[in-house]
Amino acid sequence: MSTPNIAQDFPELFDLQSNRFGDDLSSPESNMLSPQINTSFFSPMGEVAPPGTVSPKDLFFDASAPPSTTFTDLSTPPLDTPGFFSQNTSPMINTEMDLNAVPEEWESLFPQDGFSLDLDSAALELAASLQQPKATGPPPTPVIRASASPAPSASPAPSRQGTKHSTVAGVNARQRKPLPPIKFDSADPAAMKRARNTEAARKSRARKLERQGEMERRIEELERMLEESKQREEYWRSMAKTGTN
């Protein structure tokens, strides 16, 4: 195959009257239109490509996209086909390529009844019985046992006035004995310091106990006043009822 000369072919391409077009463009400097440039790249690729060259069609034959490119579909179609590029890609790819052309008519990847389990009827009945509230009936009547001894007369319940929980439980307050005097060696500085700390702790504890006793007496007084106010309220309420009748 002869090497084409672009400078000589320009008069025929552009229908020029003169053949000096190539002479005007020819110069010692190598350029795109100079006959001095190597024109091997204008020849077909099959002649200059080495035997081990792989075409892009062979690279994309397995429908795998290069890792450094981005495509609209999951992969690139063959180069000899127009290809169908869309943004409605789906991970479900049929190897036979017999999918419907309308994506809305495809079968769902996650069917609603795909995870349905067959439940035992006995288990359903048991669950329904557990969810039903139990019927609440009247409380059972206590059984009164007859005894030979006469029943004690009903005595009025004692008021809470001046009554402590410890007294009802049979627990009496411990009688506190007077503490012994603090003895220490006046020649020992550590013993003197320990004695002063002990005396300060005793005074603090005594003040705390005194404060606690005052609070207990105040609570008893308030409870007594509350009980008296309740009694007065009941008295005047009963008087109002008798007056209206």
From Swiss-Prot:
Motif (Nuclear localization signal): 193-211
GO cellular component: nucleus
Biased composition (Basic and acidic residues): 196-214
GO MF entries: DNA binding; DNA-binding transcription factor activity
Residue stretches making up the bZIP domain: 187-245
One GO process term, biological-process aspect: amino acid biosynthetic process
Coarse class of the protein's main subcellular location: nucleus
Biased composition annotated in UniProt, kind: Low complexity: 146-159
SUPFAM superfamilies, A to Z: Leucine zipper domain
Region Disordered, residue ranges: 19-38, 68-91, 128-214
Family designation: Belongs to the bZIP family. GCN4 subfamily.
Quaternary state and interactors: Homodimer.
Function field: Master transcriptional regulator that mediates the response to amino acid starvation. Binds variations of the DNA sequence 5'-ATGA[CG]TCAT-3'.
Domain remark from Swiss-Prot or TrEMBL: The leucine-zipper is atypical but could still mediate protein-protein interaction.
Protein's UniProt name: Cross-pathway control protein A
Organism listed in the record: Aspergillus niger
